[in-house]
Amino acid sequence: MSLYERESEESAVAGPSLDSEDQQQRIEARRLRIVTRIEAKRREALGEDLKILKKKTEEPRKSHKQTEDSRQRLGKLVNDGSQLVTNIQIATDARETQRRGEEEELKRLRREKLDNEAKSSLEKFEEITKRWTLDKAKQVPQKMWEILNTQQQQCAQLIEDKNNLISDLQKELRRKDDQYVKDLKKQAEDIDLLVERMEEQIKNLIKTYRQELLQIEKVFELERRELLTANRNTWEQGMQGRRDKELESLMSRMKKVEEYENQLKQLRVQDGEEYNMIKIKLETDVQILQQQLQQMKATYQLNQEKLEYNYQVLKKRDEENTITKSQQKRKITRLQDVLNNLRLKQAKQVKQYKEENQSLMDDYKRIVEQYKELQKKMRHFSAVDAKMFQDIWLMNEEEMKQLVQKALEADQVIQEQQLGMCWEPPDLCFMDNVGPLLGKLKDQKSAMSLAQEVMSSHAPGDQSSASEGETDGRQCREVSAETVKHILELLCDESGFLIENKLTRLLSPLERDERSLIKLDSIFGALGVTVEEDVYKLVEFLCRYKREPEEEGDAGGSLEPGSKAHGLIHSNDVLRAVKAFVMDFQKPRGKVSRLRLMEERDSREDTEYWAAAAKAIPESRFRVWDALESALEKYYDVLGSRGQLITETVSLRQQNTELRTLLHQYLNSKINVELEIPPTQMMQGEYPHT
């Protein structure tokens, strides 16, 4: 075995081992082996004795041993700290897994409940429809009234079941909202605990690192003193060799100095000639610059005289300004007296206006009470009118359906019996309708859906317009998505007082967009903004609130060339604009009732509905009916003439029968035998073929 291999084995035994279970120790052992191999090659190349290296490597360095011990202790401390911190994450993951399992079970139960309710509702509806079909043939008003009441009670029961299901789902939704807030709070507490443990681990690590660093520094200091003692001897030997080499280099330097002096003499001669040439050139340049200096002095004298004149003019103007300032001070004194008088008048007018305001407030309250009473009466009359309208509609609709059914039966008889054609029933989808037609309200997105779409658009240069269609006779509005996003961000930043402090603390760890959406939800709830149209109203109002003062400024004076005619609202004006919006545009909102639907219904659909009933039988069938009517009239005339002919034929047959009877009696009479030439013989001779 070579000396290098023995040294490698000894260093492996003394330091980190390649067979260690710790990966860091194996890496460190490989590094030490590579360093030892390189050092051995270097010493072998320099001719040093490897026995000295063997003596040095027999014992491991104290610094390496202390460093390895410190590394192991610190690694164990870091692993323990990481395990302590990850315990929180593991507990959170387990809790989230449990919550998801419970959520799946609740979702399954809710789906089963909805399916059962849908089946029961469908069975009730089929029972109501079947009962209506069976009782439709009854024409007694009293029985019809009882049947209608029964059907109405069953429909009310069905609607009540639906409302109960909706109420249960809303309660479940509120419970989920509360659970969501609690989960957010729990997550915030877990994060605080996690941060606290991490800070504690950081403090412990810093403290331990400092202690280990002090120990390592002490060991290195001890090794340093030992190395200084060993290197000092080597240094003295090297200094002696250095003195000898310096003496040799000094002798060679003296020789080079003599050579350099000769070269310097030659360079001085060359530089002297170049200096004379440059001196002549520079003297010429100096003369040219002196001429330019004289010209500059003349220009300076002229400018000085101009400045003296301007100074005298400014001094005269300063005296005039002093006189004007004294006059303005006297004018300010007079205006101060006028201001005091105006303040007294203002105080009187404020008092008077307060009294008038109180009187107007009393009148306003009285008018509001009258308005509420009038509104109550209007709702009552609207309900009565709606009920009457519905009753008349149902009566006319029933009569219309009966007439249409009779016409269809007549058309079927004509097609099948008279024309012998296959009868195809027309489209009678309007016959399925019962009751007045309700106008279809336009579907609108919610305010939060619009806010989510706008906030999720990250393109800063997006100039696409968010257009809104015509609603209640208004023209469609176009507002850029960038403007809507900027206005909503201003609302989030400036309307923080509308958000609860508890919710604000919970939103702090979220991202900016998610935090803005939750803030907008609270702000929209406070302002009563529920649908897309309300959001555009708010944005347009804020834009107008910004433009109106600018338009007043344009009327009072001219704008600067670089100023913008239309800018977005400033953040300082947001609160005043929101207050004005609430006072001017916000109205109490209620649920959309059936009366409101009846008021907003489109009467054009009524015309189309009744026109569809009138056109249940197409125009082509009417032309067929007209042609059939004229043909039947002609057929009736033919049948009439045939009836007359049949009557005449019956009469002739009766006469013929009587004549045959008389003839038979005459032929069978006994008197014919007694005659020599009976009439029958003559008849047979005249008619032999008979």
Curated annotation (Swiss-Prot):
PANTHER family referenced in this protein's UniProt entry, alphabetically: DYNEIN REGULATORY COMPLEX PROTEIN 1, NYD-SP28 PROTEIN
UniProt region (Disordered), positions on chain: 1-25, 49-72, 451-476
Subcellular localization, as worded in the UniProt entry: Cytoplasm, Cytoskeleton, Cilium axoneme; Cytoplasm, Cytoskeleton, Flagellum axoneme
Swiss-Prot/TrEMBL keywords: Cell projection, Cilium, Coiled coil, Cytoplasm, Cytoskeleton, Flagellum
Pfam family, one: NYD-SP28
Coiled-coil features, chain-numbered ranges: 92-419
Biological process terms in GO annotation: axonemal dynein complex assembly; cilium-dependent cell motility; regulation of cilium movement
Chief location: cytoplasm
Name of the protein described by the UniProt record: Dynein regulatory complex protein 1
Gene Ontology terms: cellular component: axonemal dynein complex; axoneme; motile cilium
InterPro entries, alphabetized: DRC1/2_N (IPR039505), DRC1/DRC2 (IPR039750), DRC1_C (IPR029440)
Subunit architecture: Component of the nexin-dynein regulatory complex (N-DRC).
Claim: Coiled coil is one of the keywords in the record: yes
Task of the protein: Component of the nexin-dynein regulatory complex (N-DRC) a key regulator of ciliary/flagellar motility which maintains the alignment and integrity of the distal axoneme and regulates microtubule sliding in motile axonemes. Plays a critical role in the assembly of N-DRC and also stabilizes the assembly of multiple inner dynein arms and radial spokes. Coassembles with CCDC65/DRC2 to form a central scaffold needed for assembly of the N-DRC and its attachment to the outer doublet microtubules.
Family, per entry: Belongs to the DRC1 family.
